[in-house]
Amino acid sequence: MKIIEFRKKIPYLRYLEMQEKLRKFRKECILFLEHAPTITGGINYNPENLLVKPEFLESMGIQIHWTQRGGDFTAHEPGQLVLYSHVDLKKRNLSIRFYLENLLRSVIDSVRSTWDLQLISDSDSPGLYLESNPSQKICSIGVNFKSFFTSHGIAFNLSNDLKTFRCINPCGRNWTNMTSVKDLGLDFGLHKRDELISCLKKNLCSFLEPINVSSS
């Protein structure tokens, strides 16, 4: 399995093309990247949770795409760390539940190691929330399990300004419930981003055993 860090922002459509090729050839790969301002709707999206018209999004330079991942609407923007994980569950004999639990556990442990920040999950609303304020969401999750090969993944709010979230009710909740490392007054510098990625690699390796780390 390869782990690739993209230093430049990746267009969302380019990612959709990449994940289809990875699934077609069942090539395992973990990607770390950022997107330009983008709104995506999952297979369970509620039209009422899109608060503005597509024409307004276009005028603001915000893309909108419909995807096959689970969940409702979410947003991507610069400063948000996106982790896309492509894993062959069939080959590894892993259950969907095991994969999701360990993906979230990897993020929880990595964030705690990086900032001493405690996160919790919510079985009624996927994602990760502040233990000190469970209404505040800092990490979104949406995964596709087609053919028992995963795609999409998690989006962690690091230094993004959260403005794109104002156009939606993310996962059906008010956008004001979203927070970020920056909003919490914690160090969000590049060295912290790199530290978080390093921790994520280590924790993901503990249950996926990836190899061949590279950068792009």
UniProtKB/Swiss-Prot annotation:
The keyword Cytoplasm belongs to this UniProt entry's keyword annotation: yes
Site (Lowers pKa of active site Cys): 137
Single GO BP term: protein modification process
Family, similarity comment: Belongs to the LipB family.
Known EC number: 2.3.1.181
GO cellular component, one term: cytoplasm
Function according to Swiss-Prot or TrEMBL: Catalyzes the transfer of endogenously produced octanoic acid from octanoyl-acyl-carrier-protein onto the lipoyl domains of lipoate-dependent enzymes. Lipoyl-ACP can also act as a substrate although octanoyl-ACP is likely to be the physiological substrate.
Subcellular locations according to the entry: Cytoplasm
Family annotation (InterPro entries): aa-tRNA-synth_II/BPL/LPL, BPL_LPL_catalytic, Octanoyltransferase, Octanoyltransferase_CS
Any further remark recorded for this protein: In the reaction, the free carboxyl group of octanoic acid is attached via an amide linkage to the epsilon-amino group of a specific lysine residue of lipoyl domains of lipoate-dependent enzymes.
Name this protein carries in UniProt: Octanoyltransferase
Catalytic center residues: 171
Pathway info: Protein modification; protein lipoylation via endogenous pathway; protein N(6)-(lipoyl)lysine from octanoyl-[acyl-carrier-protein]: step 1/2
Keywords: Acyltransferase, Cytoplasm, Transferase
MF term (GO), any: lipoyl(octanoyl) transferase activity
Chief location category: cytoplasm
Binding site residues for substrate: 69-76, 140-142, 153-155
Catalytic activity line of the entry: octanoyl-[ACP] + L-lysyl-[protein] = N(6)-octanoyl-L-lysyl-[protein] + holo-[ACP] + H(+)
CDD domains documented for this protein: LipB (cd16444)
BPL/LPL catalytic domain mapped to chain residues: 24-212
